[in-house]
Amino acid sequence: PSAGPTRAVEELYDCQADPQDLNNLAKSGKHREILKRLRTEHVRHITATADLGFLPESEAWELFSKQTGWELGQAGRVPLAGIHQAAAQVGVASERVFLKNLDSDNPTIRYWGAIGLAVRPEISGMAKRKLRRKISDPSLAARIEIANALATHGDIPNALPALIDSMQHENLIVVTHAARIIELLGKKANSAKYAIEEALKRADKIRPADTPATVVLPGDKDLAMFVSFSCRAFLNKLDE
């Protein structure tokens, strides 16, 4: 298929007849029962394994500060059912569902609610107003995605301050998240240039720029590489 800005919400391929996975059968009536079976198995699997991959990375590492992910998952201490459902709604549910998710007490559900709005082709004025009200969400992951949703739908002035502020956070996972959003905004986020330059200096101080990407280093030295990737890509776009 032709390259595009997004992928299909669901993909189903006949790997024997179509080894290059070019013909997506997810909407094929002939394959409906297979798709239903795989959906059911997917839900069973992520439930049985207590899949924590739906947590934003900054929130996950905060949870893992005292217990491992395995211990948390097996003990049922993370309310995964609602999180899994919120993630599954992205690209499928109505705007109303995502606005409701923004009001959840669970920060990860708010995070997925914001992503759900960001990927919609367009959102209402009411949704934009709600995103503006939520831009100071106490969860940094949710806040960054709320800013992303606003920026994606044209409200750069209200989105950028939250992203720029996040670029100065002590946690480089948060910085990486914000830097990636700014990188993807490209020249529309021109006013973030100084914050990006400062973050790049910080990253290069932690991990020298000439360190090969194939060298895996612990902690912030590894995260600094990803901050550097996004910062350099953004600055290169500004120079084009």
What are these model-derived regions, one by one?
Residues P1-K27, E33, P56, E62-S65:
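C-terminal, low-complexity/hydrophilic appendages and adjacent surface loops
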Residues G91-D103, E122-S136, D155-Q168, K188-R202, ...:
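Amphipathic alpha-helical scaffolding segments comprising HEAT/armadillo-like alpha-solenoid repeats
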Residues A17, V43-T47, K187, K201:
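Sec-exported extracytoplasmic/periplasmic mature domains
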Residues K30-E33, R37, T108:
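Generic recognition of stable, solvent-exposed alpha-helical segments in well-folded globular domains
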Residues G4, K36-R37, R44-A48, E57-N101, ...:
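Extracellular/periplasmic ectodomains of large secreted or surface enzymes and adhesion receptors
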Residues G76-V92, T108-I123, R133, A141-I156, ...:
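Structural detector for internal amphipathic alpha-helices that build alpha-solenoid repeat scaffolds
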